[in-house]
Amino acid sequence: MNIAIRNPVPIRREEGSLQVALDPADRIETAKVFAVYGKGGIGKSTTSSNLSVAFSKLGKRVLQIGCDPKHDSTFTLTKRLAPTVIDALESVNFHSEELRPEDFVVEGFNGVKCVEAGGPPAGTGCGGYVVGQTVKLLKEHHLLEDTDVVVFDVLGDVVCGGFASPLQHADRALIVTANDFDSIFAMNRIVAAIHSKSKNYGVRLGGVIANRSAKTDEIDRFNAAVGLRRLAHFPDLDVVRRSRLKKSTLFEMEPSPELKAVTDEYMQLAETLWAGADPCEAVPMKDRDLFEFLGFD
């Protein structure tokens, strides 16, 4: 019996960062890919889902991939908690060839395709591995060939090698933040992770999305200092809270002038990103420097 042995994937070390090179066969080459990061609870899933709808309203074929073990990224699109990739794989003892696309892909509002990667039980395994397996599974079933836009909605502000794995696939990383100390502090750490990964991967920072904030003065001041730009601003509105409780995207809510301003902003954001947002060559601050920089006495 002949046993085929694949050459190991090379490991690169850059400035103390141990990084596994992406197998060329796993690259997403047929779509524009965005990875959405931000502090935990900042509204990344809300932002990702409404951005996905905005892309779909531009006539684009959209796939949203939730990268959180809670698997709650896409429920406003699908109106339910979708089955996870890891659960689907476990059901067939990890024989992926036995799965059908409908076992792990759910079509949501306005035709947005939704996938929840899921993750290992708490305290075990690596979530980044699950993200990698999700992309491989999508490729095996040729589900990326008819896709124009992929949106990765990534867990919290975790920037370990595992949950930084969507950066291997992304063209642009987007950071969702609020106009407060904790959100901007988390954003700086994410900038540092992306700055490190961009040495080996093609990902670049696309910009910042201000969320749940009446003002953006601290965000804008930080952006100017490190080399970022604000792409959109979504204030803290009750209609957003109600849309989550209704398990709906903002585009499905009862029309109002306030809501129209928000959905118009999402449409403008989608148009900007589709046209090709120039990369931000941001350089993160050191933690202590940022501590002194933010806020006022």
Swiss-Prot record:
The keyword ATP-binding applies. Mg(2+) binds at residue 45. Transmembrane segments: none annotated. Pfam families: Fer4_NifH (PF00142). Binds 1 [4Fe-4S] cluster per dimer. InterPro entries: NifH/chlL_CS, NifH/frxC, P-loop_NTPase, Protochlorophyllide_ATP-bd. Its cofactor is [4Fe-4S] cluster. PROSITE patterns: NIFH_FRXC_1, NIFH_FRXC_2, NIFH_FRXC_3. It comes from the Bacteria. One of its GO terms (molecular function) is ATP binding. SUPFAM superfamilies: P-loop containing nucleoside triphosphate hydrolases (SSF52540). It catalyses: chlorophyllide a + oxidized 2[4Fe-4S]-[ferredoxin] + 2 ADP + 2 phosphate = protochlorophyllide a + reduced 2[4Fe-4S]-[ferredoxin] + 2 ATP + 2 H2O. Pathway: Porphyrin-containing compound metabolism; bacteriochlorophyll biosynthesis (light-independent). One of its GO terms (biological process) is light-independent bacteriochlorophyll biosynthetic process. [4Fe-4S] cluster binds at residues 126, 160. Keywords: 4Fe-4S, ATP-binding, Bacteriochlorophyll biosynthesis, Chlorophyll biosynthesis, Iron, Iron-sulfur, Magnesium, Metal-binding, Nucleotide-binding, Oxidoreductase, Photosynthesis. Homodimer. Protochlorophyllide reductase is composed of three subunits; BchL, BchN and BchB. HAMAP family: ChlL_BchL. Component of the dark-operative protochlorophyllide reductase (DPOR) that uses Mg-ATP and reduced ferredoxin to reduce ring D of protochlorophyllide (Pchlide) to form chlorophyllide a (Chlide). This reaction is light-independent. The L component serves as a unique electron donor to the NB-component of the complex, and binds Mg-ATP. This is Light-independent protochlorophyllide reductase iron-sulfur ATP-binding protein. It comes from Methylorubrum populi (strain ATCC BAA-705 / NCIMB 13946 / BJ001) (Methylobacterium populi).
